Structure formats: structure tokens, C-alpha cells
Regions:
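Short, small-residue-biased leader/transition segments that mark boundaries at the very start
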Residues: 2-4, 219, 223-225, 230
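Structural signature of hydrophobic alpha-helical transmembrane segments
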Residues: 85-96, 137-147
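Membrane-interface loop-to-helix entry segments
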Residues: 15-27, 92-93, 119, 140-143
């Protein structure tokens, strides 16, 4: 459906920042915490050796995902009407400014473009805007994409600092950016477009309730299976 809306609380997630992305991110987080890092990943002897096998292919994959996201978000509208152009423009802007944010942070930290940040930025922007791409202004979408990239990069560095081995960046991109995007619906979306009948504060509360509900359900269902994988 175009909008996931719990009628009792008014939770809204247009194209799945939570229902699609955060679900995968919560599952990934529980798995990496239970399974632990790859052998030798954080040892001094192997420092810098655990890198991607082909960054050009990873960038190509990112561009393919970016292109496919127009169908993902636009198709979630369920009809080819006047809402679709705004959805596509917001999707593009969030991803573009996520890319620029990742590039800017990599230059600030490393004095050169870091391929991983260049990949992380647009993907985080795409995930973040997915929940509210139909109900935000273009300027707001830019802000959501920028913050999504910043949040994802921060979470990625946080995981590395505490030696939590997320091989493909599922937690920073899908979980962190997805949670941010879901909260952003309550903060910035046009309440008339959402159609929940809630005030701004009530909508923010509904978004938090939805996030926590998904978190609870996922960890109850998933943790037992992750422990089985470890054994």
C-alpha cells in the first residue's frame, strides 16, 4: 500500500523507511552483536586489510539502486497522479545531497574522497526520504538527505570504534537513516497530506511509537535465530 498507517496511533511510513529498511537494520544489528566480528578484523596485524574487493563495482551498484529507487518510491504512490513528480524530485534531492554530504565529510576527515562515504551518503539519503517523500517540500527533502548521511556516517564510525563488525553497512544505512527518516515524517511532513488528523506533536509521538513497536517485534522474533547461527 502507499501508506502504512496504524489507525489507532496514526503512524505513517509512505514507502518503507521503517517497514522495509529499519526492519532489515534491526535484524542486522541483532545478528552482528550476537555473532561478533570476523576473525582478525580488529587485530593490529590485519589493520586496513579488511576492505571491499571492488569499489568501482560497489559504486556501480549504488547508482543502480539509486535509479531503482525512483520506481520504489514513485510506485508506492499506487497511481500515476500529480503526487508522483514531487515524490521523484524529493527522492533525487535527498540522494544527491546525501552524496555531497558524504563527499564533504570525507574531504574534511581524510583530505580526499573516501569511496565508502561516497557510497554511504546517497544510500542513507534515499533510505531517509523514503518515509516522507510524498509529504515534504523539496527544501525539507534536502535537509532530510543531509542529516541522513551524517547520521549514517556517525553510526558507522561508532560501530567501528566499539568493534562491531557490520560488513555491508546495513546498520548505518538501513537502521540509522531509516529511523531518522521515520522521525522526520513527524517533524516536517505536511499534516494535511498525511491525513492522520493528528497535531504535529501527536504525529511525532506516533512515529516514535511505531519505531519502538517494530524494534520490539523484530528482536523478539530474531534473537533466538541469531543465537542458533552462532552455535
Amino acid at each position: 500500500s502507499d501508506v502504512y498507517k496504524r489507525q489507532d496511533i496514526g503512524f505513517v511510513d509512505f514507502a518503507g523507511s521503517t517497514i522495509v529498511h529499519s526492519v532489515g537494520g534491526w535484524i542486522a544489528l541483532s545478528a552482528v552483536l550476537i555473532l561478533g566480528p570476523r576473525i582478525g578484523k580488529y587485530s593490529d596485524a590485519n589493520k586496513g586489510k579488511f576492505t571491499g574487493s571492488s569499489f568501482p563495482l560497489a559504486v556501480l551498484g549504488t547508482l543502480i539502486l539509486w535509479f531503482g529507487w525512483f520506481g520504489f518510491n514513485g510506485g508506492s504512490n499506487g497511481a500515476m497522479d500529480e503526487a508522483v513528480p514531487l515524490i521523484l524530485i524529493n527522492t533525487f534531492l535527498a540522494a544527491s545531497f546525501g552524496l555531497l554530504t558524504g563527499l564533504g565529510i570525507s574531504f574534511a576527515l581524510f583530505k580526499k574522497p573516501d569511496p565508502y562515504y561516497v557510497i554511504l551518503g546517497p544510500l542513507a539519503g534515499l533510505v531517509a526520504i523514503t518515509a516522507g517523500c510524498n509529504s515534504m517540500t523539496s527544501v525539507t527533502s534536502i535537509f532530510v538527505g543531509i542529516i541522513g548521511a551524517v547520521v549514517a556516517i556517525f553510526v558507522n564510525e561508532f560501530l567501528n570504534k566499539f568493534e562491531i563488525d557490520d560488513v555491508v553497512g546495513a546498520v548505518p544505512v538501513h537502521l540509522a537513516a531509516g529511523v531518522w527518516g521515520t522521525i522526520a515524517v513527524g517533524l516536517f511532513s505536511d499534516l494535511e497530506i498525511l491525513g492522520t488528523g493528528l497535531t504535529r506533536l501527536e504525529q511525532i509521538k506516533a512515529q516514535f511509537i511505531g519505531i519502538v513497536s517494530i524494534l520490539s517485534l523484530i528482536h523478539i522474533c530474531r534473537c533466538r535465530r541469531s543465537y542458533a547461527c552462532r552455535s
